[in-house]
């Protein structure tokens, strides 16, 4: 038989060693025996015994030989017994180096798994490509060390239980040796269920839950376990490319960020928290890890996605399906918490959406703390000396799901997931080109930095712990936003939404966009390659055309030159793209509104400016992320630095403020924020004569009806603010203002709140007029230039 390759780690050094051979076929045993013969030849004075490792879930009788070998003083050698070394060994089979994408898919068929070839296939491999067979040895351990671990970590006492423990440790050691050869992307937790059920820690917690049984806990662990396989790992990239085939095949990464994350993941386990705009995100993260040869992630997903053949396949690719609404099931909550802790303790990486669900508006939602609290508990309990929270920004040039989101905004119901839904989803990806997918990895947040050392004060103070979790989660989300590149799609959509259906020419689009690009360059904000191309007329044309045909822009080219506009029915879809770039213009938009407010203020206009800036921040806090108050004030001051002696000019007021705003480039508040305050104002108008404790559904229905009336009357600029999604946060604002609870002065405060919002909308009108004057002046100047030519 042709000799296989041996891994460098597959060398025996101890004088008395028991080799546990994990084999599935006689061919593998022959290879291991050949390797063992080489070891005996190198160390003629050493004693190497070999025993076939019992398979998982082997009957008690299969463990008899191992039980005997583990008995103290079993062998005659003086070094035998407790000082004897245990070394697990197996043969791994590598896939062909030139395997195609079709070959990876074919591996799903019976008998085609390249990692587990049949005996006949193994003999053929050894004849034709023996380098694909490799003998590997796991890390060795002394019997005494294993016995001490067994006593410290399990509740078992029988010597047969010890043999099972040694078998599990051997398989885990082999798994580690295997992924060192195959690559970090194949790293996955093994034997989770038997390890956890045998754990003294787990069983002690189980005893504290009334009515809990080991059997029920085991079933829940089966539901959570991933059942990872190498073939499924290979399929991750194939399925990922299939689901994202409408995009450029290569994802856009920042190589410096990838290198920094690789170094961080070598030191600590991590939770990858990604922004969530599309179902595609679920494949983007695993593919991104594979693309960059990084350890895989075990991604949490709703059990509603575990349907048909996709459920088992996604499980074997690392998806952990969790139930929803688990508040009344203490056993499930406990098992899930311990499962998360176990995975973290074993230094595997987890991943889920920091927002908990897809953002159907295009902007980031507030972070959800449920799973995060379980990870924090594992850290505070000392299961890791630190855990990194690695943000992941995922953004797209375009998404086909915006049509669905626009329907949600108008009040439509969510389409249930299923095989038909999956077919339609994948089919839609191939209908046209959606541009690029941008993946960014900002600097990770250290859990130790926010929660202190393990076993610290937060373990005894739930309120302080929750506050620390909130601050930590918001910091992750903030870093995600700061790393998210501004796209051409977002900028073009934002501009065309401001025209309220009036079409713009290519020259008008091009010269108006330059102010925004200049601002982003001054701020050193990250921008996509598509946004960089907006510097040229050709880049603007390409961006506008990519959005045309109702996606969501309409192009008219039946006249002298093409023009582009957004029709009323497409405003909700376009708003998704606009909302994805608001974070880059949020503070400068607030500056404009605060200046407009100060123009009409009595007394100290500088104080009025700052008071209004902080008030706007407070009103918008449910829709957007902000820096803390101190940093926010510093950012606003920096935004005003474009105008020399701005406080002096602001204090004068009147025409000085007009001049300040006219000189400001760009003016973005109307484009970015108006729609949110219009939605707030609609809800405030509904509250005028609504019951004190009006429910969310009733409030939304009334707001939809009133909003449609306002659109018909021209009392709002477009149909965009008439959105169930915006009304949901508008209600949060009202609750925060204590306007949805019985009170003696409730009616007066509701009227006052509506008046405040109308005054803010008046400020929008003021800034918008100045922006229009800027546009007209640019048009006049451009026309003069063309006339000279």
Curated annotation (Swiss-Prot):
Pathway assigned in UniProt: Phospholipid metabolism; CDP-diacylglycerol biosynthesis; CDP-diacylglycerol from sn-glycerol 3-phosphate: step 1/3
Give the residue interval(s) assigned to the motif HXXXXD motif: 275-280
Q: What is its main location?
A: membrane
GO MF annotations in UniProt: glycerol-3-phosphate O-acyltransferase activity
Per the UniProt entry, the Enzyme Commission number(s) are: 2.3.1.15
Q: Which reaction does it catalyse?
A: sn-glycerol 3-phosphate + an acyl-CoA = a 1-acyl-sn-glycero-3-phosphate + CoA
- InterPro entries with a match to the protein in the record: GPAT/DHAPAT, GPAT/DHAPAT_C, GPAT/DHAPAT_LPLAT, GPAT_PlsB, Plipid/glycerol_acylTrfase
Which keywords describe this protein according to UniProt? Acyltransferase, Cell membrane, Lipid biosynthesis, Lipid metabolism, Membrane, Phospholipid biosynthesis, Phospholipid metabolism, Transferase
Can you cite a GO biological process for this protein? Answer: CDP-diacylglycerol biosynthetic process
CC terms in the record's Gene Ontology section:
plasma membrane
The EC class name is transferase
- In which compartments does the protein localize? Cell membrane
Q: How does it sit in the membrane?
A: Peripheral membrane protein
Which Pfam families does this UniProt record tie to the protein? Acyltransferase (PF01553), GPAT_C (PF19277)
What protein family is recorded? Belongs to the GPAT/DAPAT family.
Quote the record's domain comment: The HXXXXD motif is essential for acyltransferase activity and may constitute the binding site for the phosphate moiety of the glycerol-3-phosphate.
What's this protein's name?
Glycerol-3-phosphate acyltransferase
């Amino acid at each position: 038989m042709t000799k296989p390759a041996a891994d460098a780690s597959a060398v025996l050094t101890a004088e008395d060693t028991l080799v546990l051979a994990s084999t599935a076929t006689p061919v593998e045993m022959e290879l291991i025996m050949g390797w063992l013969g080489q070891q005996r030849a190198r160390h003629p004075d050493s004693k190497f015994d070999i025993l076939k490792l019992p398979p998982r879930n082997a009957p008690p009788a299969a463990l008899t030989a191992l039980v005997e070998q583990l008995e103290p003083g079993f062998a005659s050698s003086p070094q035998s017994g407790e000082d004897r070394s245990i070394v697990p060994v197996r043969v791994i089979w590598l896939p062909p180096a030139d395997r195609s994408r079709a070959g990876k898919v074919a591996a799903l068929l019976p008998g085609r798994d390249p990692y587990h070839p049949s005996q006949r296939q193994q003999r053929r491999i050894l004849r034709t490509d023996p380098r694909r067979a490799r003998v590997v040895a796991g890390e060795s351990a002394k019997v005494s060390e294993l016995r001490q671990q067994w006593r410290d970590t399990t509740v078992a006492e029988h010597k047969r239980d010890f043999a099972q423990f040694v078998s599990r440790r051997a398989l885990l050691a082999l798994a580690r040796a295997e992924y060192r050869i195959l690559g970090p992307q194949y790293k996955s937790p093994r034997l989770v269920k038997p390890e956890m059920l045998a754990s003294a820690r787990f069983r002690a917690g189980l005893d504290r839950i009334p009515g809990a049984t080991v059997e029920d806990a085991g079933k829940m662990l089966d539901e959570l376990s991933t059942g990872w396989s190498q073939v499924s790992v290979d399929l991750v990239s194939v399925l990922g490319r299939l689901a994202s085939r409408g995009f450029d095949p290569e994802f856009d990464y920042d190589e410096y960020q990838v290198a920094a994350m690789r170094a961080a993941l070598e030191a600590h386990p991590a939770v990858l928290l990604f922004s969530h705009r599309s179902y595609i995100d679920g494949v983007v993260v695993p593919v991104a890890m594979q693309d960059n040869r990084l350890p895989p992630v075990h991604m949490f997903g709703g059990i509603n996605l575990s349907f048909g053949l996709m459920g088992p396949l996604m499980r074997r690719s690392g998806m952990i399906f969790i139930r929803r609404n688990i508040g009344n099931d203490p056993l499930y909550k406990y098992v899930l918490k311990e499962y998360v802790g176990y995975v973290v303790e074993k230094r595997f990486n987890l991943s889920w959406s920091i927002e908990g669900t897809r953002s159907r508006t295009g902007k980031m939602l507030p972070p959800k703390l449920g799973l995060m609290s379980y990870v924090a508990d594992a850290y505070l309990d000392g299961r890791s000396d630190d855990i990194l929270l690695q943000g992941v920004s995922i953004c797209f040039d375009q998404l086909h799901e915006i049509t669905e989101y626009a329907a949600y905004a108008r009040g439509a119901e969510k389409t249930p997931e299923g095989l038909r839904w999956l077919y339609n989803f994948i089919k839609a990806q191939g209908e046209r080109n959606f541009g690029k997918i941008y993946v960014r990895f900002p600097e990770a947040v250290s859990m130790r930095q926010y929660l202190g050392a393990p076993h610290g004060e937060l373990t005894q103070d739930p309120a302080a712990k929750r506050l620390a979790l909130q601050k930590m989660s918001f910091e992750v989300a903030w870093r995600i936003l700061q790393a998210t590149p501004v796209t051409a799609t977002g900028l073009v959509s934002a501009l065309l939404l401001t025209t309220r259906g009036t079409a713009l020419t290519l020259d008008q689009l091009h010269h108006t966009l330059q102010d925004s690009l200049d601002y982003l360059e001054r701020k050193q904000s990250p921008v996509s390659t598509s946004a960089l191309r907006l510097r040229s007329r050709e880049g603007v044309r390409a961006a506008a055309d990519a959005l045309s045909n109702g996606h969501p822009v309409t192009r008219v080219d039946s006249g002298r030159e093409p023009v582009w506009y957004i029709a009323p029915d497409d405003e909700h879809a376009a708003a998704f793209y606009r909302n994805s770039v608001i974070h880059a213009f949020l503070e400068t938009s607030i500056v404009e509104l605060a200046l407009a407010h100060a123009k009409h203020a009595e007394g100290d206009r500088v104080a009025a400016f700052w008071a209004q800036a902080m008030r706007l921040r407070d009103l918008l806090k449910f829709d957007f992320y902000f820096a803390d108050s101190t940093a926010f004030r510093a950012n606003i001051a920096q935004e005003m630095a474009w105008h020399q002696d701005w406080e002096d000019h602001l204090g004068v007021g009147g025409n000085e403020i007009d001049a300040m705003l006219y000189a400001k480039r760009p003016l973005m508040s109307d484009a970015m924020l108006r729609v949110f305050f219009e939605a707030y104002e609609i809800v405030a108008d509904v509250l005028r004569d609504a019951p004190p404790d009006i429910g969310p559904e009733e409030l939304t229905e009334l707001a939809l009806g009133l909003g449609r009336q306002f659109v018909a009357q021209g009392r709002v600029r477009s149909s965009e603010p008439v959105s169930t999604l915006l009304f949901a946060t508008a209600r949060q604002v009202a609750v925060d203002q204590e306007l949805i609870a019985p009170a003696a002065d409730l009616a007066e405060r509701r009227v006052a709140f509506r008046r405040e919002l109308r005054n803010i909308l008046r400020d929008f009108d003021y800034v918008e007029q100045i922006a229009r004057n800027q546009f007209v002046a640019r048009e006049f100047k451009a026309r003069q230039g063309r006339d000279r030519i």
